[in-house]
Regions:
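Extended substrate-binding grooves/exosites of carbohydrate-active enzymes
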Residues: 1-211
């Protein structure tokens, strides 16, 4: 690395600051990061009790299934963003693929942002919210994308958007508001917890200003 002045780090973003201080002339980047495993459209709750795999042999698309050598998309992105000298990161992986069965025993991995059928997992919308610099229409993506749970069950709702001010409306009224800040780890998405009630509408709105 000292010869090329270029250093890629696999799952060791924690070393960035130390190595940058020792070698300020190095170009540092994340050569392999994240490794969150997800089954598209499968949600296991609560969010804070994430497991690699559940009794149904599926991972959770909330982003709370992480391998022991990896990090959540939020943690991985935040560590990279905090290192202003970092060139960026390569996330493992863009697509699910056959082989390296994780979790075992299945024929394919679940690391992808997009599954083997070409459909976006919820992490796609997170990365779009923080990476997309094109002048496109603003968007909101709500996770879980399905709304079918047990009556009264507390549901963690994650909202990804390029809009900074998010309001959640539930049961016909404004339920709560959050601020998204793409430079702060615990504000990379808007997170709400609501009790599930069948046939009660849930809607999310995003704004550029808190005064809207």
């Amino acid at each position: 690395a000292d010869y090329l002045k270029l250093a890629g780090y696999n799952y060791t973003e924690k070393l960035y600051d130390e190595h940058h201080e020792k070698h300020p002339d190095w170009v540092i980047y994340g050569s392999e990061t994240a490794s969150t495993v997800r089954s598209r459209g499968i949600y296991h709750l609560p969010y804070d009790t994430g497991l690699l795999v559940y009794d149904d042999l599926q991972c959770s698309d909330l982003g709370n299934s992480v391998v022991n050598w990896g990090a959540s998309p939020f943690r991985s992105f935040a560590m990279d963003a905090a290192a202003e000298y970092s060139m960026g990161q390569f996330v493992w992986t863009g697509f699910d693929y056959i082989g390296e069965p994780t979790p075992y025993n299945t024929k394919n991995s679940y690391f992808g942002i997009i599954d083997t059928a070409g459909f976006e997992k919820d992490s796609f919308w997170f990365y779009k919210s923080v990476w997309d610099i094109a002048e496109e229409e603003s968007f909101i993506h709500v996770s879980p994308c399905c709304w079918d749970f047990n009556e009264g069950q507390l549901i963690d709702v994650l909202v990804y958007s390029d809009l900074p001010f998010i309001r959640l409306h539930y049961c016909g009224e404004m339920y709560d508001g959050k601020v998204i800040d793409h430079l702060t780890e615990d504000k990379l998405c808007a997170r709400f917890t609501v009790p599930f009630h069948k046939n009660k509408p849930l809607a999310v709105r995003g704004y550029l200003s808190p005064d809207c």
